[in-house]
Structures are given as structure tokens and as C-alpha cells.
Amino acid sequence: MWLPLLLGALLWAVLWLLRDRQSLPASDAFIFITGCDSGFGRLLALQLDQKGFQVLAGCLTPSGAEDLQQMASSRLHTTLLDITDPQNVQQVAKWVKTRVGETGLFGLVNNAGVAGIIGPTPWLTQDDFQRVLSVNTLGPIGVTLALLPLLQQARGRVVNITSVLGRIAANGGGYCVSKFGLEAFSDSLRRDMAPFGVQVSIVEPGFFRTPVTNLESLESTLKACWARLPPAIQAHYGEAFLDTYLRVQRRIMNLICDPELTKVTSCLEHALTARHPRTRYSPGWDAKLLWLPASYLPARVVDAVLTWILPRPAQSVS
């Protein structure tokens, strides 16, 4: 009884692998990437440039654009892009249209993102959430909408970089909220654009060593957040809470942050070049073995584990 099932499962796995490895013919198609100053965006831009693609790289800073241009071939072109500025987004969309012409835009990679303040929700303000959402959610939405006609023209692909924290909210702050939002946008966009030949993929990395996970930056922003709190709220938590929270965060980040960014850019490249791109990619051992399995557990179990790991406020009543 079990043998036919095992053989069927094995056959399905082999066919899936063969299908997954089918690639499109070598191409010099246009790919637009946001957030190319550093991290995944910069590495992907150089990776695709070496493969012969015509990369259009959006950078936030002139220094980031200049540095990338010096490392790349003459095929790669940079432009300054602040995805939180709708006017700038429209200007860049016109620049992209001029570059791609009648060919259209084959690939859009929404990579730009920020961490914001990672910490207890009662410490935060609405502006704290707004700043992160404007970059991580509303920014990619604006860029995508501006470039959809060019993507439809080429029957291209949209690849949105979210996070495993878009599947499980492991901490407070706007980051998880923003990534959940981008996941939802990506799912609806995939269904809405399928009739027009535009494919949408989501890449949900685990923890990698990028500017978003820079410990010095995360710790300094949380300390500044603590310093502005009213004395009453500080008293609820106690001075020891902040020190313990930072220590736990440091220990976790040092343990699970992966330095091999190519694990992510390989998924991004597959989403752009595979004949049958996946709906979702989960690069990183922690994504596959920790965060995604945890996202399917009962909320009570996840809450209990996270409560056990993180410090308790001084005036906790439970």
C-alpha cells in the first residue's frame, strides 16, 4: 500500500525539481531594482550585470550610486530614488520608460527597506510606525503601480522582498506590520496581474547580515526610544528591562544572522530567470527551520515561547 504512495511522491518531487530548474533563454532584458546602495540590492545589481542583464539601479544616496557604478559595467545605469517621495517615484518611472523604450520592463525588484525601532509596542508613537510603513509598504506599492504599464508591456515579473517576519510577528515595531502588509499586496497583485502575463514572486529571507540587521543601529534607536519615554512608562518596565532586552537581542542576532547574502540573491535571480518562478522563496536556515514552522503553530504556543525568551516588565501583573 505504501510503496505506490512513496513512488508517487518521489516521481512528483523529481518532476518538480526538473520544472523548477527550467530557465528562460539568456537575455539582456531590463531589470529595475530599488535600494541598491547596499545589501541585497547592491549585490543583486552586480550579479545580474555580470549575467548580461541591463540593470537599472535605484539608489537613495549619490555615494551609493557612484560606488555601484564604479563596480559595474557600462550596461548598468543608476538613478537617485527615494521611494517615500511620490514625485520622485514618478520622475524615475519616466526615466525607466525612456531607457526601456518599446521593449518594456521585464523585472522589478522591490528591495529597499528599513528596520525602524524594534521594541515593545507601548514605547512607540504612530509616527514611528508611519516612517517604517512609508518605506517598507507604501514605497514598494507606489513604485510597482508606477511601473506596471511597462511590466505589462514586457509580460514581466515583480519580485517583492518581504521577510519571515511578514509571516510571524516576533517583535514589536513597524517592521513586522510593514512586511505583513507587503505580503498581502503581493498576493493580491499576483492574482490581479496573472491575466496580463505578469508574474509576482515573494522572497521572505530569514535573518542576514545587512544594514537592516545592524546591531549598533538597532540598539542606538531603541536606547533613544527609551530615553524619550515618560517616567511613568519607564517605571513600568524598569532600567533592567532595557539592558536585558538588548542583551537577548544581541545574542539572538549573533546566533542566527547569516553572512551569505548570495542565498537571497540566488532566489531573486531564480524568480527573474526561471521559466516557472515560485510564488514564495524562503532563503536562510532560520527561515526554513524556525520561523516558517513557527508561523503554523497555535498562537498560544508562539506567545509562550517568545514571552519566555524576552524579559518581563518590572511591574508585570502576570
Curated annotation (Swiss-Prot):
It comes from Mus musculus (Mouse). It is found in: Endoplasmic reticulum membrane. The gene is Rdh5. Disruption phenotype: Mutant mice develop normally and are fertile. No abnormalities can be found in the retinal structure, rhodopsin content and fundus appearance of their eyes. Mice display a mild visual phenotype of impaired dark adaptation and accumulation of 11-cis- and 13-cis-retinols and 11-cis- and 13-cis-retinyl esters in the eyes. PANTHER family: RETINOL DEHYDROGENASE 5, SHORT-CHAIN DEHYDROGENASE/REDUCTASE FAMILY 9C. It catalyses: 11-cis-retinol + NAD(+) = 11-cis-retinal + NADH + H(+); 9-cis-retinol + NAD(+) = 9-cis-retinal + NADH + H(+); 13-cis-retinol + NAD(+) = 13-cis-retinal + NADH + H(+); androsterone + NAD(+) = 5alpha-androstan-3,17-dione + NADH + H(+). Its EC number is 1.1.1.209, 1.1.1.315, 1.1.1.53. Keywords: Endoplasmic reticulum, Lipid metabolism, Membrane, NAD, Oxidoreductase, Sensory transduction, Steroid metabolism, Transmembrane, Transmembrane helix, Vision. The active site is at Y175. Residues 310-318 are cytoplasmic. NADP(+) binds at residues 32-56. GO terms for biological process: retinoid metabolic process; retinol metabolic process; steroid metabolic process; visual perception. Expressed in eye, liver, kidney, brain, intestine, placenta, epididymus and submaxillary gland. In eye, strongly expressed in the retinal pigment epithelium, with lower expression levels detected in the inner segment of the photoreceptor cells and in the outer plexiform layer. In kidney, strong expression detected in the distal tubules and the transitional epithelium in the renal pelvis, with weaker expression detected in the epithelium of the outer stripe of the outer zone of the medulla. In liver, detected in hepatocytes in the centrilobular area. Catalyzes the oxidation of cis-isomers of retinol, including 11-cis-, 9-cis-, and 13-cis-retinol in an NAD-dependent manner. Has no activity towards all-trans retinal. Plays a significant role in 11-cis retinol oxidation in the retinal pigment epithelium cells (RPE). Also recognizes steroids (androsterone, androstanediol) as its substrates. Signal peptide: none annotated. It is a multi-pass membrane protein. Inhibited by 9-cis-, 13-cis- and all-trans-retinoic acids, with the most potent inhibitor being 13-cis-retinoic acid. Weakly inhibited by oleic acid. This is Retinol dehydrogenase 5. Belongs to the short-chain dehydrogenases/reductases (SDR) family. Pfam families: adh_short. Homodimer. Substrate binds at S163. InterPro entries: NAD(P)-bd_dom_sf (IPR036291), SDR_fam (IPR002347).
